[in-house]
């Protein structure tokens, strides 16, 4: 199935095939989700079959909305598809932009809607092995140190989020 994502071409938002957007480094829409619980953040290790950054640790969920799909709807859909997570309310935090080389001649140039949710105790993710090979609850207080200690094991965008946008993402993140 060919997936078309909202991409800016010559200043106009248009549906462009996802791989083409990455090969050309075109600016496109994306979402990122951070699920928290009791001071921890849920990280996922990307499946080895992913076409870029396989086997690297990332935030809870990140993807691209399909053409004409709202960011929050996309976030909820992918939480379910990747991690079997349903019915966790998400709060929009902000929209940020970054550009990163993700290897293999691919560039992520994303305008990202960031969402944060709180997973209740007793609820656990159920990994889709085509998308996720491992999950881990990591203390928010030590996440940046862990990424700094082993930078090659984390996605470029997680580095960027922690370096440039952590205050936006995590400030009052657990408030109702």
Swiss-Prot record:
CDD domains the record matches: NUDIX_IPP_Isomerase
Keywords assigned: Chlorophyll biosynthesis, Cytoplasm, Isomerase, Isoprene biosynthesis, Magnesium, Manganese, Metal-binding, Photosynthesis
Residues bound to Mn(2+): 22, 28, 64, 108, 110
Pathway noted in the entry: Isoprenoid biosynthesis; dimethylallyl diphosphate biosynthesis; dimethylallyl diphosphate from isopentenyl diphosphate: step 1/1; Porphyrin-containing compound metabolism; chlorophyll biosynthesis
The organism's place on the tree of life at top rank: Bacteria
Entry annotated with the keyword Manganese: yes
GO terms under cellular component: cytoplasm
The keyword Isomerase is annotated on this UniProt entry: yes
Cellular localisation: Cytoplasm
Signal peptide range: none
Molecular function in Gene Ontology: isopentenyl-diphosphate delta-isomerase activity; metal ion binding
PROSITE patterns (UniProt xref): NUDIX
UniProt-listed Pfam families: NUDIX
Catalytic activity: isopentenyl diphosphate = dimethylallyl diphosphate
Residues annotated as catalytic: 62, 110
Binding site for Mg(2+): 82
EC number(s) on file: 5.3.3.2
Cofactor needs: Mg(2+); Mn(2+)
Residue ranges of every copy of the Nudix hydrolase domain listed in the record: 26-160
UniProt cofactor note: Binds 1 Mg(2+) ion per subunit. The magnesium ion binds only when substrate is bound. Binds 1 Mn(2+) ion per subunit.
GO biological process: chlorophyll biosynthetic process; dimethylallyl diphosphate biosynthetic process; isopentenyl diphosphate biosynthetic process; photosynthesis
Stated family: Belongs to the IPP isomerase type 1 family.
Role: Catalyzes the 1,3-allylic rearrangement of the homoallylic substrate isopentenyl (IPP) to its highly electrophilic allylic isomer, dimethylallyl diphosphate (DMAPP).
Protein name per Swiss-Prot or TrEMBL: Isopentenyl-diphosphate Delta-isomerase
The organism of origin for this protein: Jannaschia sp. (strain CCS1)
Gene from which this protein is expressed: idi
């Amino acid at each position: 199935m060919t997936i078309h994502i909202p991409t800016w071409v010559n200043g106009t938002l248009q549906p462009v095939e996802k791989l083409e957007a990455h090969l050309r480094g075109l600016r496109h829409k994306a979402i990122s989700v951070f699920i928290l619980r009791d001071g921890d953040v849920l990280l996922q290790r990307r499946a080895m079959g992913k076409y870029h950054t396989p086997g690297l640790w990332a935030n809870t969920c990140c993807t691209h909305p399909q053409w004409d799909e709202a960011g929050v709807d996309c976030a909820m859909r992918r939480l379910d598809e990747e991690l079997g997570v349903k019915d966790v309310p998400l709060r929009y935090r902000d929209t940020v932009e970054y550009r990163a080389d993700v290897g293999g001649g691919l560039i992520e140039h994303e305008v990202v809607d960031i969402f944060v949710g709180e997973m209740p105790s007793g609820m656990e993710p159920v990994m889709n092995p085509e998308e996720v090979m491992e999950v881990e609850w990591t203390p928010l207080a030590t996440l940046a140190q862990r990424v700094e200690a082993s930078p090659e094991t984390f996605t470029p965008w997680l580095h960027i989020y922690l370096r440039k946008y952590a205050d936006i993402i995590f400030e009052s993140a657990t408030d109702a």
